[in-house]
Amino acid sequence: MTQLSSSDVPGMGRRQFMNLLTFGSVTGVALGALYPVVNYFIPPRAAGAGGGTTAKDELGNAITATGWLSSHPEGDRSLVQGLKGDPTYLIVEGPDAIGSYGINAICTHLGCVVPWNSGANKFMCPCHGSQYDATGKVVRGPAPLSLALANVSVENDNVFVSQWTETDFRTGDKPWWA
């Protein structure tokens, strides 16, 4: 074999080197900027056996059933972070029982957070006056639909919220939110 002389070997010129350096830098910045966007669409990993997400308090701490039941009386409806971080009401059904379903607190009219009015025993939207009964069924408009439901389960004292796919027990219809 013959060796090529150094003058016959093509070298990388300054312009080509700068082009490669610029391309690499722009690609790195673009991938770095896209990471949070892609990460947004990946579901959270903290899940129960049913594929739900861990219910969290207003500070983002995981909720334990014993802790929740010790600080909330029977019949209480209090907000937690549920599916996709949406505000969801956990229902205390007894001194040692959290309800098997949660109620999404987002109004079906314009998306306001609907507070629980314990005096009237219903959810009342402050934005346009929609009202929902204790189960989240719409009783007065302008909201067109009942509040969405979520399954609630307790496993090893951890509270999990998962997608509701069963028939809506309030209307007998398929869930509109699934």
Swiss-Prot record:
Q: Which branch of life, at top level? A: Bacteria
Q: Which organism is it from?
A: Parasynechococcus marenigrum (strain WH8102)
Q: Which GO terms describe its cellular component?
A: plasma membrane-derived thylakoid membrane
Q: What is this protein called?
A: Cytochrome b6-f complex iron-sulfur subunit
Q: Any note on cofactor binding?
A: Binds 1 [2Fe-2S] cluster per subunit.
Q: What catalytic activity is recorded? A: 2 oxidized [plastocyanin] + a plastoquinol + 2 H(+)(in) = 2 reduced [plastocyanin] + a plastoquinone + 4 H(+)(out)
Q: Kindly state which keywords UniProt assigns to this record, in alphabetical order.
A: 2Fe-2S, Disulfide bond, Electron transport, Iron, Iron-sulfur, Membrane, Metal-binding, Thylakoid, Translocase, Transmembrane, Transmembrane helix, Transport
Question: Can you name one GO molecular function term for this protein?
Answer: oxidoreductase activity, acting on paired donors, with incorporation or reduction of molecular oxygen
UniProt lists the gene as petC
* Miscellaneous comment: The Rieske iron-sulfur protein is a high potential 2Fe-2S protein.
